[in-house]
Regions:
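Phosphate- and other anionic-substrate recognition elements at nucleic-acid/protein interfaces
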Residues: 1-156
Length: 156
């Protein structure tokens, strides 16, 4: 059974947790660069995300529900909401059941230590044969996605 965990930000990731093999495959959130009003912008690539999901027997997806943070600008909040919408739309197109989960819920359930390093450390503990996926500080999106998928598998 494949459970998908998604950290939906532009520096997030998508994790495919195989509950039988107890392994995880992680891909960085697919993004594309485009120019709007003369400025370079990045957004989630719906087509590439769909390609990553295609052909897999996915049982369910768990998507991190993140709210706007104090101090974020309107453009930033809109951009994040657009990313969430793209991800939810692609999952819906593949008829994959989606559960939204707060960071607090999944972090507590997987016994994650606080902070981004805590996420990477916990992912390396749970998936030691794939620890190289979570080695770098910037791999926190990967570790979050993997832990969200693990959380999803444990709560089904």
């Amino acid at each position: 059974m494949i459970i998908v965990g998604i950290d939906p930000g532009l520096s997030g990731a998508v994790a495919f947790y195989d509950t039988v093999e107890q392994t995880v495959e992680v891909v960085d959130m697919p993004v594309l660069e485009l120019v709007r009003n003369g400025k370079k912008k990045r957004e989630v690539s719906a087509q590439t995300l769909a390609n990553h999901l295609a052909g897999r027997k996915i049982y369910a997806a768990f998507l991190e529900r993140v709210n706007a943070m104090t101090g974020q600008g309107v453009t930033s909040v809109f951009s994040f909401g657009r990313s969430m919408g793209i991800v939810e739309g692609v999952l819906a197109a593949y008829d994959i059941p989606v559960t939204l989960v707060t960071p607090q819920a999944w972090q507590k359930a997987v016994n994650q230590r606080a902070g981004k390093d805590g996420s990477r450390e916990r992912a390396m503990q749970l998936f030691p044969s794939q620890a190289d996926l979570f080695q770098r500080k910037k791999d926190d999106g990967r570790s979050d996605a993997a832990l969200i998928a693990y959380y999803g598998a444990k709560t089904l």
